[in-house]
Regions:
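Short, glycine-/small- and polar/acidic-enriched structural segments
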Residues: 1-76, 80-83, 100-106, 122-123
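Pocket-lining segment of extracytoplasmic ligand-binding domains
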Residues: 7-8, 82, 86-180
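Short, solvent-exposed polar/charged micro-motifs at secondary-structure junctions
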Residues: 32-34, 131-134, 206
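Flexible glycine/proline-enriched surface loops and loop-helix/loop-strand junctions
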Residues: 45-49, 142, 202-205
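Short aromatic/hydrophobic-glycine micro-motifs
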Residues: 73, 117-119, 187
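Short helix-coil transition/hinge motifs at the ends and kinks of transmembrane helices
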Residues: 75-76, 129-136, 190-194
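An extracytoplasmic/periplasmic, membrane-proximal ligand-sensing/linker region
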Residues: 113-114, 176-206
Length: 206
């Protein structure tokens, strides 16, 4: 059993010739357009601008390009997207006001906003995706399992799924207590960041 980004799950599905399957969706989009200014209020406002992002060749790039294209913006011609290797790099640039517009995931969005009050959340990928009227939500993370394992251990696997669902519900309902655990185990550096980031992190069990 593994908790993985959806694009990696699809790669493993193909590499194993279908030996793995998605058991649940655990994360919708955690991506946001943020800016140190007040110029972006719609996707159309990004035309002609430079936006910094991470995840070239992965979900952030594919999702961003799709949203742009569906809004009449050519990702190759109408906007300049500068890709960086790490979200921490973009976060540091935003904190120092070197960048005005960027695509960042949670909890980096919360961290940056807490350290620089000039940075604001301009757009949510979840909201922009839903505006397109597709039949599905934007998915970021999934629970992946080997089919053979699930078939050979149905009781244990179903127990895991039940406990995982309960854990998801608990975290969403008890953000302050969950934030303390998240900080203690080093998932996010500080509990106050986790408290603010959790409601924006699209943690689900579907």
């Amino acid at each position: 059993i593994a908790l993985l980004p959806c694009n990696l799950a699809s790669v493993l599905y193909n590499k194993t010739q279908g030996a793995v399957q998605v058991a649940a969706i655990n994360t919708l989009s955690v991506l946001y357009v943020v800016e140190s200014g007040d110029t972006v209020h719609s996707i159309q406002d990004l035309a002609g601008k430079t936006v910094y992002s991470t995840g070239k060749g992965t979900t952030p790039e594919f999702a961003f390009n799709y949203i742009l294209s569906q809004n009449g913006i050519d990702p190759q011609k109408d906007i300049t997207i500068e890709y960086k290797s790490e979200s921490t790099e973009i976060a540091a640039m935003l904190q120092n006001a070197e960048v005005t517009i960027a695509v960042l995931p949670q909890p980096y969005v919360t961290t940056v906003k807490m350290q620089n009050d000039k940075v604001r959340t301009a757009l949510s990928f979840n909201e922009e995706w839903d505006k397109l009227g597709t039949d599905s939500s934007m998915v970021t993370g999934v629970v992946l399992v080997r089919k053979a394992f699930a078939e050979e251990n149905p009781l244990a696997f179903n127990e895991f799924l039940d406990e995982y669902k309960a854990s998801t519900e608990y975290v969403n309902a008890n953000t302050e207590e969950a934030a303390e655990w998240i900080a203690e185990y080093g998932i996010v550096a500080k509990a106050p960041v986790a408290v603010k980031a959790l409601p924006e992190s699209s943690i689900v069990y579907i």
